[in-house]
Amino acid sequence: LFNRGKSQAQPTPGVETLLGDRDGQLDSLKGRDWDVVIDNSGYVPRHVRLTTELLRERVRHYLFISTVAVYADLSAAGVTEDAPLKVLADPTVEEVRRDTYGGLKALCESVVRTDFDGRYTVVRPTYLVGPGDDTDRFTYWPWRMSQGGDMLAPGTPDDPIQYLDVRDLARFVIASAATPHRGVFNACSPPDGAR
């Protein structure tokens, strides 16, 4: 487990914790080999490149958690993994904002694909819900409807939405790490799963 040591008060039992930071403080990763790396915190291509360049010869399989926000157009149902991706007007931008998030993640994916050619898995989850979701974007709506009265909601009643329970994503990621699932995969509920 590689992190800055700031967000988890107690160490995870049985798991070695390596302290560092993606922005150049990677010394604790040097001189070690791994079967699989699961990268769930890559938001800026430069940071991902620092990691992949260091680990390229020391890791057999690099698994990168991306997002469906990389797609240029999500207005139609059935977006497949080969759909066009977002392109940033300025690919050197490093500020993660609503308008740069998807494009930055697409650039991060490109770094992983280049440095781990044939040895990578990119998982593109949709909206994640479940334990640990502090956004309240999923639980708010049933709660609000239970309050009764008029309410303003985005979209139209027939707009589809696809979400994914974080526990299902975790199972898929672990299965992908344990078996030779290579390539790019969307991770979401079935297209008719929620309306």
Spell out what each predicted region is.
Residues Y101-K105:
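Active-site YXXXK catalytic motif of short-chain dehydrogenase/reductase
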